[in-house]
Amino acid sequence: MTQKNKQYKLEKGLMLFTQPRSPYFYGKIRFNKKYLTKSFAPIVSRADAELELYAWRDSLFKNDTPSAKTISEETGARSQYIEHEEIINDFQFLEVGRFDPQKKSLEERKISFVEIYGEYNQTEVSNQAHRCLDCGNPYCEWKCPVHNYIPDWLKLVNEGNIIEAAELCHQTNSLPEMCGRVCPQDRLCEGACTLNDGFGAVTIGSTEKYITDKAFEMGWKPDMSYRTWTDKKVAIVGAGPAGIACADVLTRSGVKSHVYDKYQEIGGLLTFGIPEFKLEKKVVKKRRDILEGMGVEFFLGKEIGKDIQFKELYENYDAVFLGMGTYTSLEGGFKGEKLPNVFKALDYLISSTNRLLKIEKDKEKFINLKGKNVIVLGGGDTAMDCNRTAVRQGAKSVKCLYRRDEKNMPGSKREVTNAKEEGVEFEFNIQPIEIIGKEKVEGIKVVRTELGDADQNGRRVPIPIPGSELIIEADAVIIAFGFRASPSDWFKDFNINTQNNGLVLAAEEQKYKFQTSNNKIFSGGDMVRGSDLVVTAIWEGREAAKSIIEYVS
């Protein structure tokens, strides 16, 4: 058995043994308040699991394992060894299945821009947290981009220690309440959960949301009593996840953080790109209150290069962090994209958010798809956001066209399921050729596809099937093909190098992580790695902040 499949952990003379990815049973034996743990191969009944556990215990008694030998030598006689023995079986995952917070009714979901998931109560969240096996090698932590201490805060919330759990969440994550809502847990932490196959993963995301929401309700705020302000200050351009995370770490370390953003609210795409039925904006507002209470200063409605020149920041701060994201929409390159009622995904989502927040500058620019037959092109989470927003606006019909099959959709399975429930129709293996219309959209010409060999990214390439063309009627088309970088004009003036695709060059593997070609300037998030998850932007913002602290010191 390789080291990858088998792990030993030495702790106070006690050998703990785990065999990861044995998803059906996990046992503990405690000797003199010390734990010996083991996970077993597939077992489907409690009786079988108990037999395995006691057989394992008996083998330890015979001193035929290194673990038993270590314990016996430390505790002395076997009588003492047995006297202090306590058997603890973790059968919670057998007795209590996965239980997600209840969704609002479909009738309510289709007409309201509020989060669709309800809340756990303390009993429910405790039961779900107790399902965690506390694996010796927690795959959930490794799969999480910020490497949250997931088993540890699950244990705390199971015990009712909400404030302690919130403190632990914030040790690795600057925005846990948002990650609990918008992370695709099904392909990250929960997808890696040992219980995922057969029993249903622990509800990590919903529990993370509960912890932070409940802690805020209880009055939790970061303890800044230990902090001493330094004479250093850093300018952060962009109040999205990367910028916020950078400011959080810097401020906790006594480095003053001034955050500039062109929008009137913080959050970046958290606020303007993610609809309220996934993330209510009061959640972002609460985080802003927390950050300002910590000492972070925001300068909003200020576009760098237009309202404020970058030179001013460069000369007046000890370092600068760029976290401006990627806001330029990718185009399909086919005829008809410029027709009226063809919209870019982000323009559509921002229009909707501005109306809901009552901050739109020009009411005539509001995009209202009520009563229209809407087609959304794309298969990612942004496409799902557009689909579900159109439903809530009262569109007559909403169809989502994707050029691969459902299995190869890049979006979260949870979001696809929610869209289907709300009435969105999906057409797979269909590729757009041309948007049809004269003075406005009348339909879209498409061709059916089949999947060929995998490309360099491991995804199978869609191949058009000759003679399979058809036209689908539509009144409006939303293009959700993703985003690309849009380097600012002033990058060259300050020696900020980019790749050919416009992404800023700021490698993680160097002395100062995420430092650009200009030593004083750091960058992270989507403008470095391309459009990605909120949680990866948080990770890079935090890591860049650590490098900045070292740099300015």
Model-derived segments and their meaning:
Residues 1-75, 80:
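Basic/aromatic DNA-contact patch characteristic of tyrosine site-specific recombinases
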Residues 86-87, 91-118, 147-159, 169-170, ...:
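Beta1-alpha1 glycine-rich phosphate/pyrophosphate-binding loop at the start
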Residues 88, 338-371, 454-531:
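FAD-site-proximal beta/loop scaffold in flavoenzymes
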Residues 109-129, 149-181, 198-227, 352-353:
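Ferredoxin-type iron-sulfur electron-transfer modules in oxidoreductases and energy-metabolism complexes
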Residues 132-135, 140, 144, 179, ...:
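Short cysteine clusters
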Residues 164, 228, 233-237, 285-334, ...:
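Feature captures the FAD/FMN-dependent oxidoreductase FAD-binding
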Residues 207, 211-228, 286-306, 329-393, ...:
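Glycine-rich dinucleotide-binding loop and its adjacent helix/turn
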Residues 386, 527-552:
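A conserved FAD-binding loop/helix module that cradles the flavin
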